[in-house]
């Protein structure tokens, strides 16, 4: 078990709460505002301490480059299967179909708010600027109700993607968090589209 100071625990809980509320990690300035620090530099020092203790990982060059570290162990065969990890989604199958489940991870669903129903294995770098990297596990709450600005898992035809959601009338714009990628524009009147879930957190495995 990681031993944290009271202030380090506060910072870690703030990160978890922010991810639960928005689907992506906070910046140093946002942590400082929430906890009443005088400057983002104070938040940075606590983040470095959390990183050194293995509670988080920090990505250089990204303002939201904070990731919670999955330290759960699956070594005990008596453990429950845990939440399913969705790998490549097979065309024509519901996202939680057995054909799509690559594995399970023993992480409590109620670690996230709203609670996670499954994890999606992230492929690609279109969301890297908010700390969602290839190979990460994206915690997803299964819902079809989302708001503009939230990070969603969406299905366009037979393809599943993770993007920031914006809708105006019958036009949906799926926005990447990487300037190398273009927005995806969907016309609901002529294209097949569905919301598969809401991002409620992101975890990197194996550290």
Swiss-Prot record:
Q: Residues at site: Cleavage? A: 91-92
Supply the alphabetized keyword list: Autocatalytic cleavage, DNA damage, DNA repair, DNA replication, DNA-binding, Hydrolase, Repressor, SOS response, Transcription, Transcription regulation
Tell me the superkingdom of the source: Bacteria
Q: Does the keyword Endoplasmic reticulum apply?
A: no
Q: Which residues form the active site?
A: 126, 163
Listed EC numbers: 3.4.21.88
Q: Which InterPro entries match?
A: LexA, LexA-like, LexA/Signal_pep-like_sf, LexA_DNA-bd_dom, LexA_repressor, Peptidase_S24_LexA, Peptidase_S24_S26A/B/C, WH-like_DNA-bd_sf
State any single GO MF term: DNA binding
Q: Where along the sequence lies the DNA-binding region? A: 28-48
Query: From which residue to which does any coiled coil extend?
Result: none
Quickly give the catalysed reaction.
Hydrolysis of Ala-|-Gly bond in repressor LexA
Instruction: Please name the Pfam families in this protein's record.
Output: LexA_DNA_bind, Peptidase_S24
| UniProt cross-references to CDD domains, sorted A to Z | S24_LexA-like (cd06529)
Name the GO terms of the biological process aspect.
DNA repair; DNA replication; negative regulation of DNA-templated transcription; proteolysis; SOS response
- Listed PANTHER family: LEXA REPRESSOR (PTHR33516), LEXA REPRESSOR-RELATED (PTHR33516:SF2)
Q: What does this protein do?
A: Represses a number of genes involved in the response to DNA damage (SOS response), including recA and lexA. In the presence of single-stranded DNA, RecA interacts with LexA causing an autocatalytic cleavage which disrupts the DNA-binding part of LexA, leading to derepression of the SOS regulon and eventually DNA repair.
| UniProt family annotation | Belongs to the peptidase S24 family.
Q: How does it assemble?
A: Homodimer.
Q: What's the name of the protein? A: LexA repressor
Q: Which organism is it from?
A: Marinomonas sp. (strain MWYL1)
The gene name reads lexA
């Amino acid at each position: 078990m990681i031993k944290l100071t009271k202030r380090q625990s506060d910072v870690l809980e703030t990160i978890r709460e922010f991810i639960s509320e928005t689907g992506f990690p906070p910046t140093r300035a946002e942590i400082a505002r929430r906890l009443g620090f005088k400057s983002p530099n104070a938040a940075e020092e606590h983040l470095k301490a959390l990183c050194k203790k293995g509670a988080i990982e920090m990505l250089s060059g990204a303002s939201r480059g904070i990731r919670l570290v999955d330290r759960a162990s699956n070594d005990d065969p008596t453990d429950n299967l845990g939440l399913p990890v969705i790998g490549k989604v097979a065309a024509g199958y519901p996202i939680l179909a057995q054909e799509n489940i690559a594995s399970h991870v023993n992480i409590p669903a109620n670690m996230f708010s709203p609670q996670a129903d499954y994890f999606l294995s992230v492929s690609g770098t279109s969301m890297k600027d908010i700390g969602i990297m290839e190979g990460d596990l994206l915690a997803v709450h299964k819902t079809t109700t989302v708001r503009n600005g939230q990070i969603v898992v969406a299905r366009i035809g037979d393809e599943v993607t993770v993007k920031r959601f914006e809708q105006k009338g019958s036009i949906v714009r799926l926005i990447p968090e990487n300037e190398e990628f273009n927005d995806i524009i969907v016309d609901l009147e002529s294209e097949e589209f569905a919301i598969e879930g809401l991002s409620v957190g992101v975890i990197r495995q194996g550290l």
